[in-house]
Amino acid sequence: IFLITDYLRTRDQMEFTPEPDMFHDIFGHLPYLTLDFYARIEDKFAPAYKKATQEEREVIKRLAWYSTEFGLVMEDNRIRVFGAGIISGRAELANTIMEFYRLSRDTVIDYSGDVFAQLQEHFDKNREDISRIIAGVKELHQKGEMSSQDQGWNVVRALYDKLGISREGYFGGEVILAPFDVEMIAQIPKTVYAFNPMFFVCESFEQMDALLDSYLKPIAERSS
């Protein structure tokens, strides 16, 4: 049994829906759930969530958000959309695809080389600025300044200016692509009502499995 919402986005919400709807559930999640690997990933969260502390539950929600909802995975040296939230949102999907193109156009990533290794290199080199951006996004959430589609990237761009981070090179697109990092994901809030400022990329399906297990499995295996 797969439970879905009874809400359907309006015509003027085709670019971006502020909450999950029937289209998201049926077009986004349902096809993925026919894939054994995706279904096994989805099954990891509930057992851990049941035994987790409140603080751990917040991390688990974010891990689910940035994997099965807004995850990206490398396959054949190309970045593939894995998250149901990306695939069912026209604007989110367009932002992601355009970022793949922009990284090449701006010579940030050379797609003839090892793409994930280059992404990891940019991430490591800019980790301090990424941490500052995440802290800033967290503060914006707490102030309620990322609660709508219009606020999303407008306030993030203003944040870049405030932090003195130039919107070029690795930071020049509509979204930041970063290697899947549990510690980093634990810090960034879920961006439900506005565009996501960051997506996380796994080197492989096996790596996603291992990284999620590294956090979820010890919690799920706790004695009751």
Where are these regions (language model features)?
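Core of folded catalytic or high-affinity ligand/protein-binding domains
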Residues: 1-224
